[in-house]
Amino acid sequence: MSEPNILLARVDNRLIHGQVATQWVSYLDANCIIVVNDDAATNRMRQGLMGMAAPADVKVVYLSVKQAIEEKASFEEGDKALLLVETPADALALVEGGVKIERLNVGIMHMKDGKHQVSATVAVDDDDVAALKALRDKGVELELRRVPSVPPEDVEKLFA
């Protein structure tokens, strides 16, 4: 058992869906998707739906934030992982808990009350901005990009 090789961490409200399964997994050559979300870790129906979108040859692991921090050494040698979180706050909790995240892709954060749109697929509120700033201050490289086939957008949009 060893720590997973996290190729990329991604904030995506939908967690596993078509874009993640077909584009990001292929682009990264990932063989493992780690979904870190307190609800998804225990919600079998949600896991089943996400599992249908995942490629058959890719291992999918569902963990709560606490489990991800405590069990970060419970992965197999050779795991090349795409780590998915629903919010920047979850990514920050992982980093503060000792999970090594070098690069965070901010992909899809849906618009809802209290948020403002900063790109076509990302809306943030004050809590999101604070977590993203803290991640950047901790040395995490931030990337604003929906899919790998398009160039990254200016990350400063996240803080406007």
Q: PLM features: what roles do these ranges have?
A:
Residues 97, 102-160:
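Glycine-rich, aromatic-bearing surface loops/beta-hairpins
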Residues 61-107:
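Ordered, amphipathic secondary-structure segments that act as subunit-interaction surfaces
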Residues 9-13, 61, 119-121:
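Short, flexible loop segments at the rims of nucleotide/cofactor-binding pockets, characterized by
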